[in-house]
Curated annotation (Swiss-Prot):
Keywords: Cell outer membrane, Membrane, Signal, Transmembrane, Transmembrane beta strand. Gene3D superfamilies: 2.40.160.20. Its main location: membrane. It comes from Neisseria gonorrhoeae. This is Opacity protein opA66.
Length: 238
């Protein structure tokens, strides 16, 4: 049975929709970093994605203030991109011969917020017997993994014009270059966030909860990660 004045331990289960913003500070393509040149495109430097994930919480209601520990695991994001372009470097109008450069870029990237273990303090505003808006703050220990494998290959080749009525001849590549950037990290950091929402008491012990939370996962070496989450769940007080 629950304690008087709405006090007592509780459990809560939520389904959350998260908007995730991931920013990677990879070396710029034109600037050397540790003797290497980055080949990573803007697509993998500034990622915006979303996911749906469950969240569970265990806490104690003090009759106004609530303190809870929560755990969530996010969906893994991964993608790949391939691009190719051909640029003419030289053309002889006298004989039709030309020199071209072919550039290929293959990228494979992933990001996974493996887990978030948080502790929150929330204050409920009792408007009436049913509705209770709330605000709060949250500190969390997060674990993320991310990787990038980007390879840029350039090939120069010569095209010789054939005799009238014949196809031109493409010579074997005579100049090849290849640059690559590989990086893989597993990082754990403490981050801070804010919480807001409203609870609706279905029964004295069962509450329907609609909430929002913003969380900054902290400086993850060369990565910044922020989430905006909207959730719907139920809270049961013992």
């Amino acid at each position: 049975a629950g304690e008087g004045n709405g006090r007592g331990p509780y459990v809560q289960a939520d389904l959350a929709y998260a908007y995730e913003h991931i920013t990677h500070d990879y070396p710029k393509p034109t600037d050397p970093s540790k003797g290497k040149l980055s080949t990573v495109s803007d697509y993998f430097r500034n990622i915006r994605t979303h996911s749906i994930h469950p969240r569970v919480s265990v806490g104690y209601d003090f009759g106004g203030w609530r303190i809870a520990a929560d755990y969530a695991r996010y969906r893994k994001w991964n993608d790949s991109k391939y691009s190719v372009s051909i640029k003419n470097l030289q053309r002889r109008t006298s004989n039709g011969n030309r020199r071209d450069r072919k550039t290929e870029n293959q990228e494979n990237g992933s990001f996974h917020a493996v887990s978030s273990l948080g502790l929150s303090a929330v204050y409920d505003f009792k408007l009436n017997d049913k509705f209770k808006p709330y605000i709060g703050a949250r500190v969390a220990y997060g674990h993320v993994r991310h990787s990038i494998d980007s390879t840029k290959k350039t090939t120069e080749f010569l095209t010789t014009a054939g005799a009238r009525g014949t196809d031109p001849t493409v010579s074997s590549p005579y100049k090849n270059t290849q640059d690559a950037h590989q990086e893989s990290n597993s990082i754990r950091r403490v981050g801070l966030g804010v919480i807001a929402g409203v609870g609706f008491d279905i029964t004295p012990n069962l509450t329907l909860d609609a909430g929002y939370r913003y969380h900054n996962w902290g400086r993850l070496e060369n990565t910044r990660f922020k989430t905006h989450e909207a959730s719907l769940g139920v809270r049961y007080r013992f």
